[in-house]
């Protein structure tokens, strides 16, 4: 299969075989994947985001299930975003934290937090065995232009505070893409996942980037509901991006 790109060159796509769905137990899924050996992949990636694709490691994929279209690509138009009451409370609750953007280069501290998060979130599923190699392959890859947004406790005696969360973020000319966020399980009361997205929105606003891509939203899936709580959310229907009304947050 091929698609016609703005460069007037053909891009090859591959369809995967069926595999277990990562969102619904008992269902099968399959994906469309841009040719991982295409040397233009890094240059194509910004347009691929606009086509509803997403990055995992060096793979750029989009769900393409035979009988299901539940996965909807979503993004935030950051200039039109306004936090709701719950999100303002999240910002206030975490105003003591230190946020900085660093190079996408693994550190021992980040790896330890990543492994702690996976053991808490995905026990016994294989991901909890990830080490340095899997960290680099899954989060960094070989061609992406990524950054890590680090969230830390306040510094003590001029030493960096404890690392609480890392939001892996791809950077393109006109957008940011939230690739993966991991955080200290014991700090769950801080709503660090939401806080990370709010920080990514502010980052995009500072750098005058139009959108923050959030991956896929699934209507009725409990783990996806948080994405609908952000205002200025847009969904891709396969041809166009259209606005979605925000759902009210539950404090």
Curated annotation (Swiss-Prot):
The keyword Cytoplasm is annotated on this UniProt entry: yes
Catalytic activities: N-terminal L-glutamyl-[protein] + L-leucyl-tRNA(Leu) = N-terminal L-leucyl-L-glutamyl-[protein] + tRNA(Leu) + H(+); N-terminal L-aspartyl-[protein] + L-leucyl-tRNA(Leu) = N-terminal L-leucyl-L-aspartyl-[protein] + tRNA(Leu) + H(+)
Highest taxon listed in the record's lineage: Bacteria
Gene Ontology MF terms: arginyl-tRNA--protein transferase activity; leucyl-tRNA--protein transferase activity
BP terms from Gene Ontology: ubiquitin-dependent protein catabolic process via the N-end rule pathway
Compartment(s) of residence: Cytoplasm
E.C. designation(s): 2.3.2.29
Signal peptide (from-to): none
Record carries keyword Amino-acid biosynthesis: no
InterPro entries attached to this UniProt entry: Acyl_CoA_acyltransferase (IPR016181), Asp_Glu_LeuTrfase (IPR017138), N-end_Aminoacyl_Trfase (IPR030700), N-end_Aminoacyl_Trfase_C (IPR007472), N-end_Aminoacyl_Trfase_N (IPR007471)
Pfam family for this entry, one: ATE_C
Family: Belongs to the R-transferase family. Bpt subfamily.
Function: Functions in the N-end rule pathway of protein degradation where it conjugates Leu from its aminoacyl-tRNA to the N-termini of proteins containing an N-terminal aspartate or glutamate.
Protein name (database record): Aspartate/glutamate leucyltransferase
């Amino acid at each position: 299969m091929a698609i016609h790109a703005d460069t007037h060159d053909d891009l090859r796509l591959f369809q995967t075989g069926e595999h277990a769905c990562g969102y619904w137990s008992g269902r099968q899924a399959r994906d469309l994947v841009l040719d991982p050996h295409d040397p233009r992949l890094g240059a194509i990636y910004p347009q691929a985001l606009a086509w509803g694709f997403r990055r995992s490691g060096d793979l750029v994929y989009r769900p393409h299930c035979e009988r299901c279209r539940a996965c909807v690509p979503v993004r935030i138009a950051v200039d039109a975003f306004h936090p709701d009451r719950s999100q303002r409370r999240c910002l206030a609750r975490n105003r003591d934290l230190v946020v900085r953007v660093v190079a996408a280069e693994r550190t021992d501290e980040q790896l330890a937090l990543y492994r702690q998060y996976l053991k808490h979130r995905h026990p016994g599923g294989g991901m909890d065995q990830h080490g340095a190699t899997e960290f680099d392959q899954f989060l960094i890859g070989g061609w992406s232009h990524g950054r890590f947004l680090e969230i830390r406790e306040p510094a003590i005696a001029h030493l960096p505070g404890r690392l609480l969360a890392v939001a892996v973020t791809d950077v393109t000319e006109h957008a940011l893409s939230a690739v993966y966020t991991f955080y200290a399980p014991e700090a769950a009361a801080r709503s660090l996942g939401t806080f990370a997205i709010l920080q990514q929105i502010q980052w995009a606003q500072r750098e005058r980037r139009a959108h923050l891509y959030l991956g896929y939203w699934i209507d009725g899936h409990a783990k996806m509901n948080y994405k609908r709580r952000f205002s200025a959310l847009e969904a891709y229907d396969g041809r166009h991006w259209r606005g979605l009304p925000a759902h009210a947050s539950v404090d």
